[in-house]
Design a protein with these regions (language model features):
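Beta-strand elements of well-folded, non-transmembrane domains
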Residues: 10-12, 56-60, 72-74, 84-86, ...
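Short, surface-exposed coil-to-beta transition loops
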Residues: 3-5, 52, 61-65, 87-92
Length: 155
């Protein structure tokens, strides 16, 4: 099991960031450039949850089907139910709080590998994960700072 934690501050307000996390429309892959549009599929969206499949081309392609839950104010969590690499129960969690006019974003990523490829990825994440995830998140925040308002919880 690999756990990566990091935090960063941004000028993007909490509601705007959470709306981007919970936007399951066709624009999602453009908001989150690390997502492969070919792997993105929305299965169901409710008032505070969404079941989706997402993936990236990293390491020959890793996909995950799981549930986003934003029922707790200021928290968005994606829990893996099925993946070609990681065990059910692996997760991403974003805790977002106001920081001046922007946000403090605290991220926890827990990966439980179930394949040899995933074990290698988990090893790499234990060394480079914080930097990689932070850089990916910073790209999204830069996009959000320059775009119009986004509606979350949509498909």
């Amino acid at each position: 099991m690999t756990t990566v934690r990091f935090s960063l501050t941004t000028e993007v307000p909490p509601h705007r960031f959470i709306n981007a996390l919970t936007d399951f429309s066709d624009r999602r892959p453009s908001l989150w450039p690390n997502l492969d549009p070919q792997c993105f599929q929305v299965h169901a969206v409710g008032p505070t949850t969404a079941e989706v499949t997402e993936g990236a081309t990293f390491a020959g392609g890793i996909w995950e089907r799981g549930t986003y839950d934003w029922s707790t104010p200021g928290t968005v969590r994606f829990t893996v139910e099925e993946s070609n690499a990681f065990a059910a129960g692996s997760f991403w969690e974003y805790q977002v709080s106001p920081d001046g006019g922007g946000s403090l974003i605290e991220v926890t990523v827990r990966r439980v590998p179930r394949t040899n490829k995933a074990r290698l990825v988990a090893l790499l994440l234990s060394v480079f994960g914080r930097r990689v995830f932070r850089n990916d998140l910073q790209r999204t925040l830069t996009l959000l700072a320059g775009t119009t308002e986004i509606q979350g919880g949509s498909s």
